[in-house]
């Protein structure tokens, strides 16, 4: 997503088109419901690893979408706005840190 966004932003900027992306983390949806139970290894991993300590709610994406669609982002292009509760900040760290 990051490289595609950057490449497209570079190519389309001359046409006054901004290209940005939203990088979602792990969200509570009907598809993730079967694994969002206490004791499920992946659920426990997400809860432990995400600094926010929870799965995201789909409504958490609204702010990012509104910002990128607004005049406030007129000079923003080639960026991915990660809405992930901070999980990317933990990549490469031991799980107990």
Q: Residues of each region from the PLM?
A:
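Alpha-helical segment proximal to the catalytic Tyr-Lys
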Residues: 10-14, 74
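Generic structural signal for alpha-helix termini and adjacent loop/cap motifs
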Residues: 38, 53, 70-73, 92
């Amino acid at each position: 997503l990051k490289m595609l966004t950057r490449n497209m932003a570079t190519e389309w900027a001359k046409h006054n088109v901004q290209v940005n992306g939203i990088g979602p983390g792990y969200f509570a949806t009907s598809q993730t419901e079967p694994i969002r139970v206490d004791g499920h290894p992946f659920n426990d991993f997400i809860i432990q690893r995400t600094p926010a300590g929870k799965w995201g709610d789909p409504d958490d994406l609204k702010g990012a979408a509104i910002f990128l669609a607004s005049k406030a982002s007129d000079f923003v292009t080639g960026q991915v706005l990660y809405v992930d509760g901070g999980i990317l900040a933990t990549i490469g760290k031991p799980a107990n840190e």
